[in-house]
Amino acid sequence: EAAGLLPFPRV
């Protein structure tokens, strides 16, 4: 989803 935007990718 917001991988790269947030410091932790949603899995």
Curated annotation (Swiss-Prot):
Record-linked InterPro entries: Periviscerokinin (IPR013231)
Alphabetized UniProt keyword annotations: Amidation, Neuropeptide, Secreted
Keyword Secreted: yes
Coiled-coil segments: none
Pfam families documented for this protein: Periviscerokin (PF08259)
Valine amide PTM positions: 11
Record has Endoplasmic reticulum as a keyword: no
Subcellular location: Secreted
Gene Ontology biological process terms in this record: neuropeptide signaling pathway
Stated role: Mediates visceral muscle contractile activity (myotropic activity).
Family from the record: Belongs to the periviscerokinin family.
Name of the protein: CAPA-Periviscerokinin-1
Organism: Karoophasma biedouwense
